[in-house]
Amino acid sequence: ALPIFIETGIPFWKYIDECFLQRTYTQTQLLGRTLLASMRVMDGKCIVATITRRMMEFYEAKTEDIEGIIDQLRITQGVEVAILLHEIGDQEYKVSLRSNNYIDVSKIASFFGGGGHVKAAGFTMRGSAHDVVNNITGHIESQMFNK
């Protein structure tokens, strides 16, 4: 199929960029800030990042500007699970989970009242960011040791 696009002069790279790669300046700023503030835990098997309401206000970001950040965390070398907390209220977080190989994040999300599938899931949780992460990593550890 690719040679046909090339022969017909269709600018397929332009469409790939526009559909999958381009982001707004706000999205780029929010991504950069989130990646810089991320941390690895569990001997580097898990990466965690938080997007606060203050960050969202500072960058004048909308909820849709967060899209794709969890995937950038997930592709970090050596990481099995990525956790992204998005603060939506006082001590309330929308949690996104992504897995690379053997951790079933849908089981974790289901335990906390959310849903998804094996490699991508989410839920909402109340508590401090630290407490939320501690609750989640306990479930990740139990799957790691029982694989």
Language model feature labels by segment:
Residues 1-111, 116-147:
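Hydrophobic helix-and-loop "lid/oligomerization" segment in the mid-to-C-terminal part
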